Structures are given as structure tokens and as C-alpha cells.
Amino acid sequence: MIPGSSPKHYKIQKLTSLDKDYRQRARSLGSSSAKAKEWGCFDVSFLTLPPVIGEISITYTVMFQTDKPLVPGDKTMTLFKTTVDYVDIVSIKSKEHLAGVCLLPGALQRHGKPIGFAVQIFFDGQEVASDSVEVGILAGRKSWWTDSKIIDSPNVATREGCLVDRMKSPFQLNDLDSYEVSR
């Protein structure tokens, strides 16, 4: 068996909660900006069993809901999704790993509050772990991110490019050694 190929080798421990924990201000380095903008930061803490895994992919899905769209014609729910590839996952000193994504400040302001955050971990194209947190109308709807009745609903807009790898955000230097390295 290839190290990392079994779902038994992975366990998702914790996802960012959907209360105010996800809102973070980016540090301002040499900027004259009067006020740092808030980003939406969504992290996953997970365990791996093999000492070294060459590469994994994590798909992050976040659903937001707003009662009053800021732009006329906007839908009340917005789905953000991205996949990030991570390399050289080493579990020699610690089996716990941390990875994450950030939602751009403009998207955070425009689309309301998160009602669902889901993570899927893939090894060699096969899903080996998944988990989610949900509130509001998604509460109790496990695997909502794969349910076409939800994600393809006429009330849901899908937005590309707004959810970015943490290592490609202003948070890349915050607690750098705690996060896995993306490709």
C-alpha cells in the first residue's frame, strides 16, 4: 500500500467555526492605509499517519448567505470553492497539520455571513477525508457541498477567484511554520 493512500491515514480534527473567528485583519506592512481590511480566513487542522506524504489536495467550499444583497439582482447565497495542492507533508515531529484559505475583503463585505464550510482531502485523486461545519439553513445538512439541490439552486451564485490559498494572501507570514506549504 502506498503511504497516504488509505482513509485510515487521515483525520480532520478541527475546522474554523462560523462565528466571528473567521474574520481576521491583515497586518499592514509599510502601508499608509487608515484601517486594515477584514478577510475571511478558513482553516483545517488534520492528522496524518504516514511519516511522509508526497502530495495531497484539499478542496475548500464556503457558502455565504445575505438577507439583503448589496447589489440589486445578486442572489441571497454565494458559493466559493477552490482546491489547493500541498507538497511534502511530513509527520515526523508532529502528526498534526494546518492548512487554509482566505476570502477577499470585498467578497466578505458583499456576501453576508458564512453558513457552511467544508473540506475534502484528496490523495492521488481519491477522497480520503472530509468534514464540514454548518449553521442556519444548512444546519444538519451533511455533505451539503455535494448536494445539487443546494449548490445548483437558483438562489445560489458561484464565485470563482475570491477564495485564495493562505500562502498567497497577506496572512502568509502569520505563523508561517505552522501551515503546510502549497505548490
List where the protein language model places each region.
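Exposed aromatic-hydrophobic patches
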Residues: Y86-G106
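Beta-strand elements of well-folded, non-transmembrane domains
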Residues: V44-P50, Y60-K68, F123-G125
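Short beta-strand elements
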Residues: M77-V90, A118-R183
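Short glycine/proline/serine/threonine-rich loop/turn segments at secondary-structure transition edges
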Residues: L103-G116
